[in-house]
Amino acid sequence: MRRQSRVKVKARGVTIGGADPLVCLPLLAATVDELPGRAAELVALGPDILEWRVDAMEGIDVGQVVALLRRLRQVIGELPLLFTCRMAAEGGRCSRASGERLALILAALDSGEIVLVDVELCSGPQSRSPVTAKARAAACPLILSHHDFHATPPADGILATFCAAEAAGADIAKVAVMPRSSGDVLSLLTACDRARQGAVGIPLIAISMGSLGVVSRVAGPLFGSDITFAAGAEASAPGQLPIGELRLAMATILGA
């Protein structure tokens, strides 16, 4: 039986940090017209959470974001929707100024259509504070995330990042790193396990990316990771498995 987080997070009918790990699919669409169809395709695959990576859509403004969120809700029904506008420095496609990106995130929170929001831990208190306040007011759980597409810190460093995210007000802490050896994958899983043993109380997302790190996406829940990301029509990060393959492998490892 996998170790659960002390703090459980509720998001439109799902429990994050409970007995069952959840699978999230990224929604990537380059144009407004593509978005509803792509969303419908992903919903049919049966994810637990859908992540709209709005940074994949260039030129979208605040008004369009709100309108598209309402349109998405009509397509996805009650499926929990995570809103992410990933900055380029952490593997995203957003080249906007920080103020423009912040405006999109705040508008999404104001819309009432999202149930989770992701912001990078490195964005700093000045950028995070308005999002944190708005998320609290909207009762929308906040994911504070850290991505390193070049290397994997030692387990102590990864654990420190989980702790920093919790201290900064995260409801969920996410760390995704790139391994250069099998030992790096073990460092990620070790840090997750130590966090779950008591160092961190909130739910965790722990990912080792690329082909070396695939095992973390499948077996991560055994070490305390609460959400894993799969590929639908398109992967949003290296190493994501198709959702059907991921669920089958997880069922085998977790004994479901």
Stretches found by the model and what they are:
Residues 2-6, 18-137, 141-143, 147-151:
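Active-site beta->alpha loop and helix N-cap motifs at the rims of alpha/beta catalytic domains
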Residues 1-10, 242-245:
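Short N-terminal or domain-adjacent regulatory/targeting segments
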Residues 12-18:
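Short boundary motifs at domain starts and secondary-structure transition points
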Residues 106, 116, 121-256:
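Catalytic alpha/beta core domains of metabolic enzymes, predominantly
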